[in-house]
A protein has these predicted regions:
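Short S/T/G/P-rich N-terminal loop/turn motif that feeds into the first structured element of a domain
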Residues: 1-57, 62-78, 87-108
Length: 108
């Protein structure tokens, strides 16, 4: 983590895996079921599919902070996002990114 990033700064995590088309409905169902019960430490989560490679799926999550993610990880045996991919028969790769700046949402 860079010196400029506050410990309370949000953190983005990405889980990704390649899935065959027959696995897509299972992943969507697992995500929709899990997204209904977001952990308190998480601000938002998205299930995304690559337009260039439809077999590539990601769960992108925004956490309150790195400490919040660590607190969540200590509270579970296996993180929910990993279980979602495993339900669809895939083992996801994990990466994390410090959120260093955000843009406000435009008013409608």
């Amino acid at each position: 983590m860079s010196a400029e990033v506050s410990a309370a700064q949000p953190l983005m995590t990405v889980l990704e895996a390649h899935l065959g088309p027959e696995q897509w409905p299972t992943l969507r169902q697992a995500f929709e079921g899990g997204a209904a019960r977001l952990p308190a430490q998480m601000l938002r989560t998205f299930l995304v599919q690559s337009g260039a490679d439809p077999t590539l799926w990601r769960v992108v999550s925004i956490w309150r902070s790195r400490a919040a993610l660590e607190e969540y990880r200590r509270s579970v045996d296996t993180p929910g996002g990993v279980l979602m991919f495993r339900a669809a028969g895939a083992e996801p790769m994990f990466s994390s990114f410090d959120v260093v700046a955000t843009m406000p949402t435009p008013l409608s």
